[in-house]
Amino acid sequence: RFKKIRRLGALPGLTSKRPRSGSDLKNPLRSGKRSQYRIRLEEKQKLRFHYGLTERQLLRYVHIARKAKGSTGQVLLQLLEMRLDNILFRLGMASTIPGARQLVNHRHILVNGRIVDIPSYRCKPRDIITTKDKQRSKALIQNFIASAPREELPNHLTIDSFQYKGLVNQIIDSKWIGLKIN
């Protein structure tokens, strides 16, 4: 993971750890002139590694975004941000997106009262995301919420940390996406 971070820059969804030498990110010595192909490839890899997607999944999202009205790049980022694993990460219920994927796969998460075990589930506005009533599920989420530093919550989400409940208010606004993409 650190190799990817050193090569592509900060990827907050991939890991909460940081490489030791802060000035070593994006080493300027080996850079040279970057071709258009290299720039596009690096941006695509940033998306893949940040959101934990395979090549095929990313191509499918690009295909959907191209069919939709509006800017393809903005629609693509909205689609990726409305995934269940990413919303859990944004709510602070998981420290990383892979951690959120594991919570979903292990059936700790309910959406609108139903167990959802698909991390790529596309959340809609007014979806209520809660944990199972099992003690183990609540303990996992409680540990994440307690240990995570309090970051500003995006305005399209609200969280009730005492009831372990999150609410999707609306589709995400582009300024809340923490990833810098060209």
From Swiss-Prot:
InterPro entries for the chain: Ribosomal_uS4, Ribosomal_uS4_bac-type, Ribosomal_uS4_CS, Ribosomal_uS4_N, S4_RNA-bd, S4_RNA-bd_sf
PROSITE patterns, alphabetized: RIBOSOMAL_S4, S4
Stretches for region Disordered: 13-32
Gene Ontology CC: chloroplast; small ribosomal subunit
Subunit structure: Part of the 30S ribosomal subunit. Contacts protein S5. The interaction surface between S4 and S5 is involved in control of translational fidelity.
Function: One of the primary rRNA binding proteins, it binds directly to 16S rRNA where it nucleates assembly of the body of the 30S subunit. With S5 and S12 plays an important role in translational accuracy.
Name the record gives this protein: Small ribosomal subunit protein uS4c
Gene name of this polypeptide: rps4
